[in-house]
């Protein structure tokens, strides 16, 4: 209601490129969505709110077959290709950014939510098929690429992508496993640390709930609590010789606004500093400096 889906799609394409194509189209004023990938035509009696299923389907198939010369020839000869045969070129197009799928979803009435989940399960690359993370071993110009394989039997490589301060369990590191299997009894090193920590409680976050699990493998996102050495962008591993492993550094925006603060009561400087450091742990874009002259 009050949304212009055609205009919204046009804005997305203007910002991110013509590779952004809809996998479905809204219908009935946003009451439902119509699949445009597996279906070349709309169901009987259904008309999308803008464009047409035929046009969207044709654009998707043409975009996907462009990455495979064999399918290009078939498409030119036959006029269409069954999308069920395009699993490999579709994944390639997604990995290379040649196709950026757009799915319409309504938070108001839930339209398109089930279809979005179906798209994620059926069409998007799984961890074994997606783009591998850019791990590096070594420092500076001497760093060499390190390929992480989504193999549960290999040694562990995991990346900490978020730090939170939970009011009940304290500092919590959330990480994605890229290689190997982590269990409750795993002994993991944090970066170049020489002393491992025992996982103990391996958690999966489901909303505000923390669900303990016995193990997790490649592609899964888990969390552990009360490991002070764990920081944003840390690499977790279970082999002592796997030192100096890190991911390609991210470019964070430079802060553009600064503010000076001080505690209301004398003697609370250290307490305030500790709180600010916790915020810095959670947000890598935040910078805190302590001016010695003014404390």
Predicted feature descriptions by range:
Residues 1-295:
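Structural and coupling elements of P-loop NTPases
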